[in-house]
């Protein structure tokens, strides 16, 4: 499996697991003195990445950022449908609103029965189908991020300025190659609508890097979102599936429906990975127009992690 260790300066971290010591080779990029070696390693890694995707019927885009620097990209020139990855972007915008407005995470929102759309993925609706109850912003974010609940996401859009406000917030962070036009319910109306919300792998990785490296809002709000990402239950067989034990990671996945001919429009994973020495990198692996089954697509993503 690829562990990004080819273009990183190798570090050795010993992790105690039960009664055994497991040695994990991890990576930390040396940007200054090892320029030639890094360039060589990037080329070698790119070759390995290309080998992973060469025979796959899909377009695969990859971006890795370490220490705030664009470490490596592959097929980054295309517009990749975001799918539910945009729930992470939305969460940043919502938390910014709470922070700037002095509102707590336990601010309550009234959830109507009409907010709980029936033909979409929604553990929230399944647990309280009758609707007409109050729920805190914290709980709605938990449903939206950790469970990727589509109704929770749209309720947050409804009460925090819609998709346009989230896109505007991204532009304010310097993220230019991004469009967030439709909410989850609207995306279900057509294939074109599913494709309309797009970004590039590098821009997605940048958003995660900005969140980790900058004080966008209070420490408590930042810690709250980071914990939600770590607790995310979706996509265990994607980036997370390719990582060794002893590594902390948080992520947001996004997966589409299939077209009438069976093509998967998009299947994505955006993550941060914390190595045993505390260093972090962000990685985005976006797959689109895949004529492969879900297991194969997940395998592609996990190999790249």
PLM regions: where:
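Bacterial Sec-dependent N-terminal signal peptides
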Residues: 1-44
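Beta-lactamase-like hydrolase cores
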Residues: 40-81, 257
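Structured C-terminal helix/loop/strand segments within mature extracytoplasmic catalytic/sensor domains
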Residues: 42-51, 55, 158-159, 163-164, ...
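Mid-domain, small-residue-enriched loop/turn segments at the edges of structured enzyme/sensor domains
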Residues: 59, 133, 154-216
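Active-site SXXK
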Residues: 81-109, 144, 283
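Short, well-structured active-site flanking segments
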Residues: 96-116, 163, 218-222
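Conserved catalytic neighborhood of penicillin-recognizing serine enzymes
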Residues: 116-154
């Amino acid at each position: 499996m690829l562990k990004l260790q080819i273009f990183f300066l190798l570090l050795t971290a010993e992790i105690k697991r039960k009664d055994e010591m497991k040695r994990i080779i991890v990576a930390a990029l040396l940007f200054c003195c090892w320029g030639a070696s890094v360039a060589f390693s990037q080329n070698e890694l790119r070759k390995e990445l290309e080998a992973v995707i060469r025979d796959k019927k899909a377009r695969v885009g990859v971006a890795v950022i370490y220490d705030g620097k664009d470490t490596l990209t592959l097929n980054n020139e295309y517009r990749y449908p975001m799918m539910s990855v945009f729930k992470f972007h939305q969460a940043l915008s919502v938390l910014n609103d709470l922070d700037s407005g002095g509102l707590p995470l336990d601010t309550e929102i009234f959830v109507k029965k009409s907010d709980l759309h029936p033909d979409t993925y929604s553990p929230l609706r399944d647990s309280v189908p009758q609707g007409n109850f109050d729920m805190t912003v914290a709980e709605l974010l938990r449903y939206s991020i950790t469970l990727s609940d589509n109704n929770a996401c749209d309720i947050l859009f409804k009460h925090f300025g819609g998709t346009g406000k989230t896109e505007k917030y991204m532009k304010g962070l310097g993220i230019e190659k991004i469009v967030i036009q439709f909410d989850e319910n609207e995306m279900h109306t057509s294939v074109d609508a599913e494709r309309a919300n797009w970004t590039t792998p590098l821009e997605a990785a940048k958003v995660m890097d900005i969140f980790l490296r900058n004080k966008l809002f209070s420490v408590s709000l930042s810690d709250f979102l980071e914990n939600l990402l770590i607790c995310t239950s979706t996509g265990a067989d994607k980036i997370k599936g390719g990582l060794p034990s002893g590594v902390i990671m948080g992520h947001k996945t996004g997966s589409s429906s299939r077209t009438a001919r069976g093509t998967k429009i998009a299947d994505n994973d955006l993550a941060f990975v914390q190595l045993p020495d505390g260093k972090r990198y962000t990685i985005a692996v976006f797959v689109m127009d895949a004529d492969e089954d879900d297991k194969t697509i997940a395998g592609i993503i996990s190999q790249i992690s």
